[in-house]
Regions:
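Long lumenal/extracellular ectodomains of secretory and single-pass membrane proteins
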Residues: 1-125, 135-204
């Protein structure tokens, strides 16, 4: 039963225990295992794993991301190919007809980026959710976020995932935010750009 289950679920641990590293199909490695064992893959099958990562960039290989959280993905800054591929492979959990315009707090109390290990930082969760939600918006709100500030600014992120992470994490902030100013500026922005009602954010 155990062997049948392992085969059907395509778990990688039996191959690892049998030292069959070069026989591993990284396209089938589950998302959690891909994160947990990536250093072991590099250590025991450096050439094969390197080819796999290069394939992610070219689009000839694939990665799974169904069981990882956005903040777990952006912590892989030392594996940019894997991070980018897993980010793009994430399922879309935003219901139809719902959209979020993120207001991101990047103040010092939120911690820091790039920890890689250790406790999850609130900033990592804020940045990852902000990017995840903003890129799913429509019209002028796609890739847009609002700074946590007394004078909130509507800003865009662009480039690859690392570039967007940096842009959002280094945005200007203050000790408090003016919610009324956010709504006022949102209304002015929508009127100026003739945004349709169905393209307006439903949540902030």
């Amino acid at each position: 039963y155990r062997k049948t289950l392992a085969h059907l679920t395509k778990v990688v641990e039996p191959q690892m225990c049998a030292n069959k590293w070069t026989e591993m199909n990284y396209n089938h490695v589950p998302s959690k295992a891909s994160q947990i064992y990536k250093n072991a893959f590099k250590r025991h099958d450096e050439a094969g794993y390197k080819t796999y990562l290069e394939g992610l960039v070219k689009g000839t290989t694939k990665v799974n991301a169904g069981a990882v959280f956005p903040y777990e993905i952006i912590r892989q800054v030392n594996e940019p190919q894997l991070m980018e591929a897993q980010w793009k492979a994430q399922p879309d959990y935003v219901p139809e007809g719902i959209s979020f315009l993120p207001i991101i707090d990047c103040s010092g109390s939120m911690g820091w980026m790039g920890a890689k290990t250790g406790p999850v930082q609130p900033l990592e969760v804020a940045i990852s959710l902000g990017l995840y939600l903003s890129e799913r918006n429509k019209s002028i709100f796609k890739d847009m976020f609002v700074t946590f500030s007394e004078d909130p600014q509507f800003q865009y992120v662009k480039g690859n995932l690392q570039a967007r992470m940096k842009q959002m994490s280094t945005s200007k902030w203050s000790m408090s935010t003016n919610i009324q100013a956010v709504f006022d500026k949102l209304l002015n922005l929508a009127l100026k750009n003739n945004v349709k009602q169905e393209d307006m954010p439903t949540h902030m």
